[in-house]
Amino acid sequence: ALHQCAPSGSALWRVDIEGQPSLFAKIVVLAMADQVRQLSQCTEIPFTVVRGQTTTAPGDNTLKVVISGEGYMAPSKMISGEIKSTFGATFHRDQPGGAPTDSEHLENIEMLAMSAPDLLEKLGLSAMAAQGDFHTLMGRASTRASAMGSLPIVGPIANRALFLERFKAIRLDAKAIPDAEVPWEYGLYLSTAHGSRGMISAPISAMILRDYIMGATDLSRYPTALLAAIHPNRFYYRELRYDL
């Protein structure tokens, strides 16, 4: 659980973890994919939970770079003393994580067949799929968070109830932005909903968060439209504008 500390203390937030001592910090960045909704400060942040599974097969694909199409495959690496190739990944909305499944191994093989059929043969995956025998494959399954517009949610977090109250005039006139202070949850930042594109969005998101946290007064290096498009408050503004 995440709790605000008394204003007199040096820390702004207390993190309580079952069976462990509490942690205290001035700055907390929530980078927990779909699990951020377990925290009271983020229960109303809307996004979809998406299950994804990767597949790892024995064999060297000899790639020097990642190939990407319907799916992707990364260059081979040594895993537990054996050269193996990892590829994927499935995309199933509103499904939980858990153990890898043979059906999703097959999905990954079928995706690879569309983008790199030669690698499919090289690794013996065609025969494996035809026989339905996946015992030599390993996998990893987890969940992603994906938001409306396939854009991540990155930036400082505001108190939703107070935001909706202070800016309620927007319900009557979307252009009439009240001269009110945004009720920030000071020291609390969010980085989630990177979906299946985290390798692209995470680096610039980290830079933006750094500048927010360090109190940069000039964020002009980033397009204003970008900051607005990924900001957590966009959902609260949308609630008001469209009277949701």
Name each model-derived stretch.
Residues 58-88:
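Conserved FAD-binding catalytic core of PHBH/FMO-like flavoproteins
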Residues 39-41, 96-98, 200:
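Short glycine-/acidic-enriched loop or helix-start segments at secondary-structure transitions
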Residues 128-244:
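C-terminal catalytic lobe of FAD-dependent flavoproteins
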Residues 14-18, 193:
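Short beta-strand segments that buttress and anchor functional surface loops
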Residues 17-68, 101-105, 120-122, 126-127:
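Central helical "cap/lid" subdomain
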Residues 79-128, 133-136:
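Conserved FAD/dinucleotide-binding core of flavoprotein oxidoreductases
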Residues 2-5, 73-75, 154:
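A structural signal for short hydrophobic beta-strand segments in well-ordered beta-sheet cores
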Residues 1-13:
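A conserved short coil-to-beta-strand element within the FAD-binding core of flavoproteins
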